[in-house]
A protein has these predicted regions:
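Catalytic pocket-lining loop regions of alpha/beta-barrel enzymes
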Residues: 100, 144-244, 272, 291, ...
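Mid-to-C-terminal alpha-helical segments outside catalytic/metal-binding sites
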Residues: 2-10, 26-44, 59-74, 78, ...
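Active-site metal-binding loops of divalent metal-dependent hydrolases
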Residues: 48, 137, 190, 215, ...
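Acidic/histidine-rich helix-loop elements
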Residues: 48-59, 107-114, 219-223
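Acidic/histidine-rich, surface-exposed loop or edge segments in extracytoplasmic proteins
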Residues: 42-50, 158
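Active-site environment of divalent metal-dependent phosphoester hydrolases
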Residues: 51-53, 82-85, 105-107, 141-143, ...
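Active-site gating/metal-coordination segments in enzymes
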Residues: 28-37, 83-163, 210-218
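Bacterial N-terminal signal peptides
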Residues: 11-23
Length: 300
């Protein structure tokens, strides 16, 4: 009887350990990675620019063909000037989610908040075209004298239920949430130069904050070509709030577009299918209310 009881207890203990271990593996994202099957996932490119210097070497047709070649089903596009975004959207409206970037003419990342009439420019473009976000714009250094402008921009975004796409460090993000806790934000490049610890802290502090990981692929992939441990923690904990992106801010990025998408698929391949799918396209599907699938490839 004693041995039978011990065997029963031992069996229950083994079963519980297996269940707990399985749950931890799922929470940790350590169960079977998607591997090469990642190539069969559609990608939503959450950080595309179609700036004027690209228009001649890369026609709108060329851009959509590049997307097709890399199974990029859809892209979030902002441009300098906005006409670039609209050219792409008019050519392939089913493939492009347009954002409204403030930059045009002599208005750029370093002076856009100080240019008279910038608010009117944004309002007029919104009235003319179906933009689904404001950005990507830069806040290089926080200047609280811009508060009134940003309050109006936030109001503009909230009226249309769209996101701000913000290129900045953590403090401007905190400041924007301080102006209005209900503002919707996509953090461009997940902070770019910020440490993984700073990224984790900000994502933890603001549960509604999304981020694109453009230009972060080599931070995410460690020197051994596996996911960096600190980034893995971010990816698993905030898998519902991350999206990949290319950042075609210069023509060299267009030149290397296939390699950029491939590098993003490489780190996604290290993740469980459920996590990889979210970051590749399902989170964007949720944000922008679009059906994203490989059926879009070859269409406009």
């Amino acid at each position: 009887m004693f041995n039978k009881k011990n065997n029963t207890v031992r069996a229950i203990s083994v079963l519980l350990s297996a269940i707990v271990g399985s749950n931890l593996a799922v929470a940790d994202g350590t169960h079977t990675p998607i591997g090469e099957a990642v190539n069969d996932l559609p990608i939503f490119d959450a950080h595309v620019h179609y700036k004027e210097p690209a228009w001649k070497p890369y026609s709108v047709k060329n851009v959509i063909e590049l997307m097709d070649q890399n199974n990029v089903a859809m892209g979030l596009v902002s441009s300098t000037p906005d006409e670039g975004t609209m050219m792409l959207w008019e050519f392939a409206p089913n493939r492009i989610v347009p954002e409204l970037r403030p930059y045009h003419g002599n208005v750029g990342s370093s002076n856009w908040t100080k240019v008279p009439g910038i608010e009117n420019y944004l309002r007029e473009r919104f009235e003319q075209y179906p933009h689904e976000g404001i950005g990507e714009f830069h806040i290089h250094s926080l200047d609280t004298t811009d508060e009134s402008l940003f309050r109006r921009i936030i109001e503009m975004a909230k009226m249309r239920d769209v996101y701000l796409h913000v290129h900045s460090g953590p403090e401007p993000i905190r400041w924007l949430y301080g102006l209005d806790p209900e503002v919707k934000i996509i953090w461009a490049h997940a902070g770019l130069g910020e440490s993984a610890g700073a990224v984790h802290a900000l994502m933890s502090e603001f549960p509604a904050l999304y981020a694109d990981t453009s230009l972060r692929e080599y931070d995410i992939l460690g020197s051994n070509r596996d996911i960096d441990s600190e980034w893995k923690k971010i990816i698993i904990e905030y898998q519902d709030r991350l999206m990949v992106g290319s950042d075609t801010w210069t023509n060299s990025q267009w030149d290397n577009y296939s390699e950029i998408i491939e590098s993003n698929r490489l780190w996604l391949s290290k993740l469980p299918r459920s996590v990889a799918e979210k970051i590749a396209f399902k989170n964007a599907q949720k944000l922008f209310g679009r059906m994203i699938s490989l059926n879009l490839i070859g269409t406009r």
